[in-house]
């Protein structure tokens, strides 16, 4: 109360006492809606390939990123707030906001690192023909909007579904999610199905 009354007593506009909103951490490389629409139009529409031969082990993930940190730990630090890490780079305190569902967590064990385009989905849309090095780069991509910290059970509910079958619980995140999905598919020249494209068009319409 004192903080709000003081500006009034001093004749200072109240707006000066209100701090600017804090920007939440976001993955890098998210395109504008217009760019995402252009990239979506450029993607090849094709029937989804087979899951035959797929294994997560074919996408070496959570590799070392220098020092004692692996990819998962780098994303936890990037996407968290006030993160404190131990000597092995594991977060011992801090918080994480999950944009998929709007939940905030204070234990790293409650957070998964989501592959925005799941590894199995990538396999079925072109990654089955990649080299192991290419699949490793995809699974640990810190440049494109492919990795983000989210609520663990929400990520598990998503599984390897595309946007035609799974969308973030928060409809307000549809736009951003679609932009990220399109950018990753475009960056890696992965195909999309007709149902997937229709879902993405609808989600981009919310932007």
Where are these regions (language model features)?
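Generic detector of short, well-ordered, non-transmembrane alpha-helical segments enriched
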Residues: 13, 64-65, 147, 177
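An acidic, glycine-rich, mixed-charge low-complexity segment common to nucleic-acid enzymes
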Residues: 22-30
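Domain-level detector of nuclease and nuclease-like folds
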Residues: 96-207
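Fungal secretory targeting signals
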Residues: 1-23
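Aromatic-lined ligand-binding clefts that engage carbohydrates, nucleic acids, or primary amines
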Residues: 29-102
């Amino acid at each position: 109360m004192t903080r709000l009354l003081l500006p009034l007593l001093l004749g200072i506009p109240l707006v000066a006492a209100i701090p600017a909103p804090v920007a939440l951490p976001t993955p890098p490389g998210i395109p504008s809606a217009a760019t995402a629409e252009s990239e979506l139009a450029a993607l090849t529409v094709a029937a989804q390939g087979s899951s035959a031969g797929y294994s997560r082990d074919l996408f070496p993930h959570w590799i070392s990123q220098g020092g004692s940190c692996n990819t998962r730990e780098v994303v936890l630090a990037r996407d968290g707030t006030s993160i404190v890490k131990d000597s092995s780079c594991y977060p011992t305190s801090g918080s994480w906001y999950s944009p998929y569902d709007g939940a905030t967590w204070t234990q790293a064990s409650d957070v998964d690192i989501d592959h925005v385009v799941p590894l199995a989905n990538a396999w079925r849309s072109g990654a089955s023909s990649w080299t192991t090095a290419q699949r490793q780069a995809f699974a640990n991509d810190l440049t494109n909007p492919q990795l983000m910290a989210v609520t663990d059970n929400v990520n598990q509910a998503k599984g390897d579904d595309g946007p035609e079958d799974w969308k973030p619980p928060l409809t307000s995140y549809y736009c951003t999610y679609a932009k990220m999905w399109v950018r990753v598919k475009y960056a890696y020249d992965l195909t999309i199905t007709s149902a997937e494209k229709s879902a993405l068009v609808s989600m981009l319409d919310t932007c």
